[in-house]
Amino acid sequence: MSPDSRDPEAQRDVGLTKNTSSVNIPLESVKTDKTSNASPIMGPGEGPKIDDTLVSWSGPDDSQNPQNMPQWKKWVITWLLSFLNVWVTFSSTIFASAVRTTSLEYGVSRVVMTLGVSLTVLGFAVGPLIWGPMSEVIGRLTPFYFGYAVFCIFQIPVGVAQNVYTILICRFFIGFFGTSAMAVTPGVLADIFSPKDRGVAVSVYAAAAFIGPIFGPIVGGFVVDSSLGWRWTAWITLILASAFGLAALVFVPETYGPIILQRRAARLRQETRNFAYHSALDENPPTLNDIIFKYFLRPFQMLIKEPILLLVTLYISLVYGVLYLFFVAYPIEFLEVRRWTHAGVAALPLLAVMLGTLAGCLTILFVTGHTYPRKMAKMGRVPPEERLKLMMVGSVSLPIGLFWFGWTSSRSVHWFAQTAAGFPIGIGLALIWVQGLSFLIDVYLMFANSALAGNTLIRSAVGAAFPLFGAPMYHKLGVNWASSLLGFLSVAMIPIPVAFYYYGPKIRAMSKFSPKL
């Protein structure tokens, strides 16, 4: 048996498509097909035995199939989970506004206190390696609610911390446990939406990934400079995250098909005393070796052997690093260079970046909604390279914004001229990020979880590192040349989507991980 033949994705496909048994039938008609596991040697004219005890969906309209949820409920779930992800990413950057204050309070350098941001992002790198596998073994809800609850709890020691070590250690665990929501949400969206309808939901989720970290320093700046003080950056996060977490506890059910069918089979065994009832997941439960290979070994194997995954991951990692570095760069520009006096006001220019990311996500929705149905009707499928058109647009928009931001850094230049540079930066971030990840999913399909696990690990490590060297770089080079350096790096990445747009099909044809469709 190949290592991939027992993947949870494969089990899910089996569980969602096989319809060999209906559970909505009179109990007296339930029977155990004791011949279903007979010898595979069959006589002439014989076909395979049907296993009447294999529990699957009762039909395409099975009410317990998450794909058949009412549309309103699907969107309640989508918006709730997106808001939970907003507060997780919000928590990663709200502390950035407290770096200056806490460094003075505890008598350490700002670089040390910047670890409060970097360690949270580092937790984002490690967490999915745990929460991803758990969500496919025991279902979506258990790891999600457990991780999110602990994420909320770890806000408390930060709020009452009496030393730097408590803050830094707890900030790491805030990222580690908070990423349970980030790791589980894409799976939930895949569970409840068909591929045709999933694009809008994924764009909403992707927008949350940008709104949270941008919103964090703005709120944090006003909180830190108010009578509340920096400790309320933790209390506000706790209040907001807990409120939405309780709402999710009420409205978000289990959505992982194989787990739902496994529980249905267990209920039938108890009600009928027929212990032959089982689900596809009972037949092929994921083993420890499967999980280790899929989430720990295969991602690195793919990063080494797959040029598409490696180069797109490097590009997305740069984008992620730039996003988190800006939470250091903006205070330097507006508090130190322009000599604004209020941290919250100095963070308001980040709203231009947020508006740009929203514009980028809306562009993706508009283009996808208009071009994909036509191509699907004409070709029967849409090649993954179609995603790269907007990614190429973003690859031009990002460096334009970075150079614009850098060379309008002067007190003699009106602040609005520099603030406006955030809009093309935001568009570039969104188009590269969302379309890059969508491209990887389309390329690797059933191996997408492994591909995204490797991508998440690398990009989060880069995102954790950038704020640490960002402040020294901006102080030494100045805002002009530090931003230009990022702009030159972005220009160097432009050939990646261009090359894969033209040569992607040939490269995919040589890949052992990209299905030949």
UniProtKB/Swiss-Prot annotation:
Gene Ontology CC: one annotated term: plasma membrane
Membrane topology: Multi-pass membrane protein
GO molecular function: transmembrane transporter activity
Keywords: Glycoprotein, Membrane, Transmembrane, Transmembrane helix, Transport, Virulence
Disulfide bonds: none
Keyword Membrane (UniProt): yes
Residues that carry a glycan: N19
Compositionally biased region (Basic and acidic residues): 1-12
Subcellular location: Membrane
InterPro entries assigned to the protein according to its UniProt record, in alphabetical order: MFS, MFS_dom, MFS_trans_sf
TM ranges: 75-95, 111-131, 141-161, 172-192, 204-224, 232-252, 308-328, 347-367, 390-410, 421-441, 457-475, 485-505
UniProt function note: MFS transporter; part of the gene cluster that mediates the biosynthesis the mycotoxin ascochitine, an o-quinone methide that plays a possible protective role against other microbial competitors in nature and is considered to be important for pathogenicity of legume-associated Didymella species.
Record family assignment: Belongs to the major facilitator superfamily. CAR1 family.
Official protein name in the record: Ascochitine biosynthesis cluster MFS transporter
Organism ancestry: Eukaryota, Fungi, Dikarya, Ascomycota, Pezizomycotina
